[in-house]
Curated annotation (Swiss-Prot):
Lineage: Viruses, Riboviria, Orthornavirae, Duplornaviricota, Resentoviricetes
Name of the protein in its database record: Minor outer capsid protein P9
GO annotation, cellular component aspect: host cell cytoplasm; viral outer capsid
Region (Disordered): 245-281, 288-307
Family affiliation: Belongs to the phytoreovirus minor outer capsid protein P9 family.
Domain of life (superkingdom): Viruses
Disulfide-linked positions: none
Organism encoding this protein: Rice dwarf virus (RDV)
Length: 351
């Protein structure tokens, strides 16, 4: 593959960031989605740098919301091969320094190159470990690995569920996540900081709400499915998440939009959420607060935890792989009537 020149490398990461900035929930379900096609193209050309690019997109404020929507889509899709989008292509890393190129790309896009969410150290390691593991374990060889794709689908769903649950726990303290925001004391800097905090808070609350909503919807749809891999995945979610009672949220959640409304089980009521002190504020309120306290020094940020950026990743997967009876081709035959095809699975040979 060889090393990429900076211009080409920046173009690849530019495409990933821009796609996640504009990513909409449900892109994965659309046939011929431009967003999915773009991410697939980037993945095919960045080799082993793919998990590092995804890691940076996870923690940068500009792409965080879109990346998490992408992960939620993969976690709740009926397309059994969609998890391969997390796998890397090839066995080479064409980047000399992914983080440096990512920084250059941010500057090229007019984004701040230090706006990275400050996650607790435990989640930082877990996120790195997860993405590195999926880079290897989410690969599927069309010649030898397709026959047990249904079992791989269940294993990957279980791994993603653990990642989402770790994120859910780590994101309870949004004030800590925004600890990287440190205004210099000027009115403009304080205003910019407050607006960014409001944006991040709103997005994190939305992601938390989407995670529980879409997982609940998946369980409702597939817990009694005739297809065993869907039943197993739904059972795994049921065991990992207290869906019936509503996964306890430490923060208030924003109203959902029409395409993101909660789906509850018959007879079960959705958890009631009231507005509290952590509810995102509108811009007018922020302006008033800044005017009233522009001379106040910025709050101190506690140390001890670090961002996920730059932390060495573990190369272990939390789920083992195993073979299963050959049922994939029969499954494709059954689903062909529903316009189910390999192209829509996201399957691609490892090269």
């Amino acid at each position: 593959m060889g090393k990429l020149q900076d211009g080409i490398a920046i173009k690849r990461i530019n495409d990933a960031i821009t796609t996640f900035k504009n990513y909409k929930l449900g892109e994965l379900e659309q046939g011929g989605s431009m967003a999915i096609n773009t991410l697939s193209n980037v993945r095919a050309h960045v080799g082993l740098a793919w998990p590092a690019i995804l890691r940076n997109c996870l923690i940068h404020t500009s792409s965080h919301l879109g990346f998490m929507k992408f992960m939620i889509d993969i976690a709740t899709t009926w397309k059994v091969g969609a998890f391969t989008l997390l796998g890397s292509v090839g066995d080479e890393d064409p980047f000399t320094d992914v983080d440096l190129i990512y920084t250059k790309t941010c500057l090229h896009l007019g984004l701040k190159d230090n706006d990275f969410l400050q996650f607790p150290e435990e989640f930082a390691y877990e996120a790195n470990s997860f993405l590195e593991a999926q880079s290897m374990n989410a690969r599927v060889d069309m010649l030898t690995g397709v026959h047990n794709i249904e079992d791989k689908y269940v294993f990957r769903i279980e791994s993603i569920s653990k990642f989402l649950k770790a994120y859910y726990t780590a994101s309870e303290d949004v004030a800590y996540l925004t600890g990287f925001i440190k205004p210099d004391g000027s009115k403009e800097s304080i205003l910019s900081a407050e607006l960014l905090k409001a944006q991040v808070t709103s997005e994190v609350l939305r992601v938390r709400n989407l995670i529980t909503t879409k997982i609940q919807q998946y369980i409702n749809l597939y817990e009694d499915s005739q297809l065993p891999h869907f039943r197993r995945a739904a059972l795994s979610y049921t065991q990992d998440w207290d869906v019936d009672g509503g996964v306890p949220a430490a923060l208030p959640q924003p109203d959902t939009t029409d395409d993101e409304s909660p789906v509850t089980k018959p007879g079960a009521s959705a958890p009631t959420v009231s507005k509290g002190a952590d509810q995102p504020e509108d811009e007018e309120i922020i302006h008033k607060k800044v005017d009233a306290s522009k001379d106040a020094p910025p709050k101190a940020v506690s140390s001890g935890n670090v961002s996920a950026r730059g932390i060495p990743a573990f190369l272990e997967d939390d789920m083992s792989e195993m073979d299963a009876p050959d049922g994939f081709h029969d499954y494709l035959t059954r689903e062909h009537e529903n316009n189910f095809d390999l192209a829509q699975l996201g399957l691609a040979p490892s090269v």
